[in-house]
UniProtKB/Swiss-Prot annotation:
Family stated for the protein in its record: Belongs to the ThTPase family.
Record-annotated membrane-spanning stretches: none
GO biological process assignments: thiamine diphosphate metabolic process; thiamine metabolic process
Domain spans labelled CYTH: 5-201
EC numbers, comma separated: 3.6.1.28
Names of the cofactor(s): Mg(2+)
Protein name in the entry: Thiamine-triphosphatase
One matching Pfam family: CYTH
GO molecular function: magnesium ion binding; thiamine triphosphate phosphatase activity
Amino acid sequence: MAQGLIEVERKFVPGPSTEERLQELGGTLEHRVTFRDSYYDTPELSLMRADYWLRQREGSGWELKCPGAAGVSGPHTEYTELTAEPSIVAQLCEVLGAEVPGAGGVAAVLGPLGLQLVASFVTKRSAWKLVLSGADGEERLLRVDLDTADFGYAVGEVEALVHKEAEVPAALEKIHHLSSLLGVLEQGRAPAKLIVYLQRFRPQDYQRLLEVYGSKEKP
């Protein structure tokens, strides 16, 4: 699999004072934006059940989230993000046991791979960034996204992007530290927008994922 950045993240339920608290901590509001996300999978959810998440974001193109290191525990997740279409196509074919086509982007292989639209919704996002210093004095940029989906669900996410697995523990330390400063419960975990969408509007698909992940929320 072509290597991409490793995304380490933790989702949480934002409160009415979350943005104010981010300002107090020295955070900077980068932008407010509205976009549509569309997720694709097979009718059996072969990708999601294997912890792969294929998304097309309006204005940003395709992204495939691939599972990170095994054994990562706690109220956070770790994924490798692929955004180059040839890498995405190659990984999709590997997961689904298909031959890699000679040419064509993601859209061209949706039909041959049996991938169809599973969910589509609009999100309003406030994107923040801030720098935290760790116990070792090293500074790390963290991003905080505060999202409200068009079906009425609000969720926040603290995220760090790293280049190699060895950097993950330090990123987790910063994420946990910022989460505590924001008043997030230590073991609290908010479900992703997609999971809530499936639970509300495609309950049979939601049950398929529960069979695999139990009470653990993905992605």
